[in-house]
Every structure is written in structure tokens, then in C-alpha cells.
């Protein structure tokens, strides 16, 4: 199915002569485009909120750089989803694994790039919404350092975790777009040290870990100074529980006024997520906030300048479309356990394609110190060329 928002049609030419001239992009339907409704994946949000009069910062930045906007893409409702299935707008095609989910919530953006309909696409990442689709669709994808990019004109979900992100099929395009959005050139120097997160590779399914082994070996040859470490001493499942607590609480705070005022329609899983956020006890919030500080301290210790950490982006490849809810809950929980560090600690992360498990793509991720986003892009270029 099409990755674009049903019934929408737009094309806005980029500025002539910019560094991205000749490239095209799509924008997740959380980004404002002047004169077009921001739907957020929910028909009532689009109907009950005003049409924006200005472009989102990320959209304007790409247009100013010469990139041409060709459409707005489907998202999980109000970005509350990790698999990419939208009850109102459908599930965008995953061309790398037909019959399987594209990953979410930036599902349409990943699908559009993977299908070759555009060169790059904007997504958002709170609990994995760029990293997961990048892994499932076989793309380069980035979750930048939290707070590095302006989020003006982007519909929020959980502000303490929200970031803008983007996708590309090849490392060269990924680097061009990254340099523009990050506002600095990609450095020539590669990372000096590599950490292999043994707990993350152990958490992934055996076939996924095995599929990533050749890429990991190439990375070790590129960065000979490497060692193994446990990323989450408290346990990846503990970090997952903390993010699973904090994110719905903030999502409820973000959307509470709208929900109580306008009584919008939601799919069951989205409504449940919002209501769970409303019901989290104060003691649980306090515990989760403490775990966030633990995660931040651990990654700050592991990732001094010049060091990168390698881990699987997702614990397994894309699941089938339309699985029943009892099967989906453990799948979502497992994915979040490998993605929670992004929302908790805010470090930049790049997912690199190139491996397949069970015939479907899986990504290898690299993390770096906060602010070292372009170092990760350089590493992605080196891995693709190796």
C-alpha cells in the first residue's frame, strides 16, 4: 500500500542550487507543511486542529537546501506505535519484507524511501520510531542527540524523548542530508574506539545476532581498538520498563486536553497506551526517573568522545502484518528493551543496513557521545565501503 497519507497530494520545490538540489524527500505526518493539515495519523486530530501556516523547521531546512518535498507520509496514530500499523490509514508496504510490518511509527517515511519513491524522508523517534523502521526496511536511519535539532512545527508525543530523524537507502545520500540537518560537515576521522554491547547481542534472537556478525567483524577491522562491555548493568528489560513508564505518562500529558475536550477516536492499542499513561502511580514514575539517571550515567561513562558502541537495532526482523494482540505485546516489549536507551539517555544512534535474518533485513546500530552525531555518520560511510 502507498506510504503517503490518503487523499493528500503536494509538491514543493526546493531552493535552486542548494547542497541537496536534485534530491526529493517526504515528511512524516507529524511535521507541519504550510497550507496542508497535520494529521498525526488520526482523522480527528486533522479535523479538530488548525491547518498550519508555516513549515516545520526540519521541512524548511531541507527545502532551503534544495531538497524537493513530494508528500506527507503515514504514521502510527499520534506516533504511539512501534510496528507501523494504522487502523485508519493502513499499513505502508515494506518492500524489503512483503507481508511484514515496516516498523513505526515513522512507517510511511521508511516505506517511501525503501520503495525508491524519494531519496530521503523525515521521521521522528521517541522510543524507536526511526531506528525500528530503518532496521525492518533495510535503511540507514538516525536518531540524533536529544535536543540537538529544532522541533518547531513537529507534533510532540513525549518531549523528554522526542527527536527528529531521517532515512536514506545509501550512505552517501544519508551523509549529505545529515550534514545539512545537523549543521556541520561530516568529519574525515573515524571513531578511535569500539565497544561491543554483549548484553544487547545476547538479547537479540540468535539468528539476528548471527546475521549481524559479518558486519560486526568489518567494524572491528575498521576500529581495531575494541572491547566488550555490558551496556545496561540493571538489565535491558529494566531500562525498557522505565521507558515504557515515562513515555506514556508524557504522551498523556501532551494529548490530555484534546482527548478530554474532543473525545477523539483511537484504535484500541493507542487508547490503551494513553490511558495507561494517565494511571501510572507516582512511585512508579519516581522509580523510572531514577532509572533514567542510571542509564544516562552509564552511557556517559561508556561513550567518551571518539568511542562508538555497537548493538543490534532490533532483536529480530519485521513481524508479520496483522498479528493478534496477545502476540504483539511481547514483540513490542522486546523491541523497546533494545531501544529504550535512546529515550532515556538521549545519545545519538545510527542504524546501518546490510544484514538479513530469516530473509528479512536487520540493522546494526552505533551509538556515540551526545553531540557526536556526525562521527556516527562517518562510521556508517566506512562500514558501507568496507
Residue map of PLM features:
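Gly/Ser-rich catalytic/binding loops embedded in alpha/beta enzyme cores
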Residues: 1-118
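Structural helix-boundary/capping segments
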Residues: 1-2, 64, 120, 126-202, ...
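Short helix-loop capping/hinge segments that flank enzyme active sites or metal/cofactor-binding pockets
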Residues: 23-40, 245-291, 353-360
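Gly/Ser-rich, acidic/histidine-flanked active-site/gating loops
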Residues: 25, 179-248
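General beta-strand structural signal in soluble alpha/beta enzymes
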Residues: 27, 69-72, 122-124, 228-229, ...
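Glycine-rich, small-residue loops and helix-cap segments
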Residues: 28, 286-386
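Short, hinge-like loop/turn segments at secondary-structure boundaries
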Residues: 86-90, 138-141, 245-246, 327-329, ...
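Acyltransferase
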Residues: 209-229, 256-261, 285, 289-306
Amino acid at each position: 500500500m502507498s506510504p503517503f497519507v490518503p487523499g493528500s497530494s503536494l509538491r514543493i520545490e526546493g531552493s535552486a542550487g542548494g547542497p541537496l538540489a536534485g534530491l526529493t524527500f517526504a515528511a512524516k505526518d507529524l511535521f507541519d507543511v504550510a497550507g496542508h493539515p497535520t494529521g498525526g495519523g488520526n482523522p480527528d486530530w486533522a479535523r479538530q486542529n488548525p491547518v498550519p501556516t508555516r513549515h516545520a523547521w526540519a521541512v524548511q531546512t531541507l527545502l532551503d537546501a534544495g531538497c524537493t518535498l513530494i508528500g506527507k507520509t503515514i504514521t502510527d496514530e499520534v506516533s504511539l506505535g512501534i510496528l507501523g500499523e494504522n487502523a485508519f490509514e493502513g499499513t505502508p508496504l515494506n518492500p524489503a519484507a512483503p507481508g511484514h510490518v515496516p516498523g513505526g511509527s515513522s512507517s510511511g517515511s521508511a516505506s517511501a524511501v525503501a520503495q525508491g519513491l524519494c531519496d530521503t524522508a523525515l521521521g521522528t523517534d521517541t522510543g524507536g520510531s526511526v531506528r525500528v523502521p530503518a532496521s525492518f526496511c533495510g535503511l540507514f536511519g538516525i536518531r540524533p542527540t536529544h535536543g540537538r535539532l529544532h522541533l518547531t512545527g513537529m507534533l510532540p508525543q513525549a518531549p523528554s524523548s522526542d527527536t527528529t530523524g531521517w532515512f536514506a537507502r545509501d550512505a552517501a545520500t544519508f551523509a549529505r542530508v545529515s550534514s545539512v540537518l545537523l549543521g556541520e560537515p561530516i568529519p574525515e576521522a573515524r571513531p578511535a574506539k569500539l565497544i561491543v554491547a554483549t548484553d544487547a547481542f545476547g538479547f537479540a534472537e540468535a539468528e539476528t545476532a548471527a546475521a549481524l556478525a559479518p558486519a560486526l567483524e568489518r567494524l572491528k577491522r575498521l576500529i581495531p581498538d575494541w572491547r566488550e562491555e555490558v551496556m545496561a548493568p540493571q538489565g535491558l528489560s529494566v531500562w525498557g520498563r522505565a521507558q515504557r513508564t515515562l513515555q506514556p505518562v508524557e504522551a498523556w500529558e501532551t494529548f490530555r486536553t484534546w482527548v478530554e475536550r474532543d473525545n477523539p477516536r483511537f484504535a484500541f492499542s493507542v487508547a490503551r497506551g494513553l490511558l495507561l499513561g494517565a494511571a501510572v502511580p507516582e512511585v512508579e514514575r519516581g522509580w523510572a526517573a531514577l532509572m533514567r539517571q542510571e542509564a544516562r550515567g552509564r552511557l556517559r561513562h561508556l561513550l567518551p568522545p571518539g568511542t562508538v558502541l555497537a548493538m543490534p537495532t532490533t532483536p529480530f526482523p519485521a513481524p508479520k502484518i496483522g498479528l493478534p494482540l496477545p502476540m504483539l505485546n511481547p514483540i513490542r516489549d522486546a523491541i523497546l528493551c533494545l531501544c529504550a536507551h535512546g529515550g532515556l539517555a538521549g545519545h545519538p544512534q545510527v542504524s546501518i543496513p546490510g544484514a538479513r535474518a530469516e530473509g528479512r533485513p536487520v540493522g546494526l546500530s552505533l551509538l556515540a557521545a551526545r553531540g557526536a552525531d556526525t562521527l556516527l555518520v562517518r562510521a556508517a560511510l566506512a562500514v558501507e565501503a568496507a
